[in-house]
Amino acid sequence: MAPSPLEDEDAPLYTVGQVADMLAVKQAFLRRVDELRVVSPQRSAGGQRRYTRYEIRVIQQVVSMADEGITLSAIRRIIDLEQQLAEVTRERDELARRLAALLPEPR
């Protein structure tokens, strides 16, 4: 059974205004984050941005880093590298699991 939209991390539920209110940022900041593709929210049929809970957590990180004086382009690079690291870690873990399945049990 599929999770309900309220339970789904990737369900595009929140408008730009709602996210701006939640995070105490300006809507223009969120639009800039989108323009730089730090996050890329889906669009409603009417073209309105719709953010997922996952994207909101990423934006919270962006706000924290921006408050520390890091530029949005640098933040985008940091997030890209974090995502690449997570992917490589998943691949490594899968390869380790497959290798362990091929090796004989220690005696």
Where are these regions (language model features)?
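Basic helix-turn-helix/winged-helix DNA-binding cores
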Residues: 1-64
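Long, leucine- and charge-enriched amphipathic alpha-helices
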Residues: 65-107
